[in-house]
């Protein structure tokens, strides 16, 4: 029972950090500002996280757990190649849209000037997502005996770039241009092009 308040305080700190990333676009978040937002001293912050980098790692862990667990569900439950790709990309866009502050972490904007390890970890997350897309596209040729005219790795990179671009627009517009806006129409076009290849 004694560990419960610590977990709640840690979660509260991470929620405040995400909120500050959303409400202060383009601004660097200092531990002093975060402590004031949380309503504790900087020393109290450091009792829960040894460094600001660890706070960002906490957000990145949340991102990884949220996205990768849902991607695994998509991989298990959906067998149609195009639906899998659409659902994976839509998951990424909806997640960013519902978590504007965290979309700055996904985009790398909030990590400028922070520890290189954080940017590397986000890069690794996107590499994992791209690997899932490659797997989905490769499985099409195994299941149907017919692949695409373009290498699956090139296609996976293109699909992920579309999602990353939408997230970048969302961050750049200070969260006004929703990443999911026009996605269904754009996906219909992309799907037609993929199926023709």
UniProtKB/Swiss-Prot annotation:
GO terms for biological process: cell division; negative regulation of division septum assembly. Residues 30-49 bind DNA. One of its GO terms (molecular function) is sequence-specific DNA binding. Keywords: Cell cycle, Cell division, Coiled coil, Cytoplasm, DNA-binding. Residues 7-67 form the HTH tetR-type domain. It comes from the Bacteria. It is found in: Cytoplasm, Nucleoid. The keyword NAD does not apply. GO terms for cellular component: bacterial nucleoid; cytoplasm. Belongs to the nucleoid occlusion factor SlmA family. NCBIfam families: PRK09480.1 (NF007015). This is Nucleoid occlusion factor SlmA. The lineage of its organism: Bacteria, Pseudomonadati, Pseudomonadota, Gammaproteobacteria, Alteromonadales. The gene is slmA.
């Amino acid at each position: 029972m004694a560990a419960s308040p610590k977990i709640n305080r840690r979660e509260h700190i991470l929620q405040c950090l995400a909120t500050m990333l959303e409400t202060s676009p383009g601004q660097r978040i200092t531990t002093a500002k975060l402590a004031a937002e949380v309503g504790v001293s900087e020393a109290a912050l450091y009792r829960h996280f040894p460094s600001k980098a660890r706070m960002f790692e906490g957000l990145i862990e949340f991102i990884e757990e949220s996205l990768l667990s849902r991607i695994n569900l998509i991989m298990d439950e959906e067998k149609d190649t195009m639906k899998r790709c659409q659902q994976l990309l839509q998951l990424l866009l909806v997640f960013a849209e519902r978590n504007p502050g965290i979309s700055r972490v996904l985009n790398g904007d909030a990590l400028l000037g922070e520890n290189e390890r954080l940017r590397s970890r986000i890069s690794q997350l996107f590499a994992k997502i791209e690997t899932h897309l490659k797997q989905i596209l490769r499985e099409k040729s195994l299941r149907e005996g017919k692949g695409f005219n373009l290498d699956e790795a090139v296609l996976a990179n293109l699909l992920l770039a579309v999602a990353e671009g939408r997230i970048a627009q969302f961050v750049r517009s200070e969260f006004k241009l929703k990443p999911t806006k026009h996605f269904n129409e754009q996906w219909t076009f992309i799907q037609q092009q993929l199926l023709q290849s």
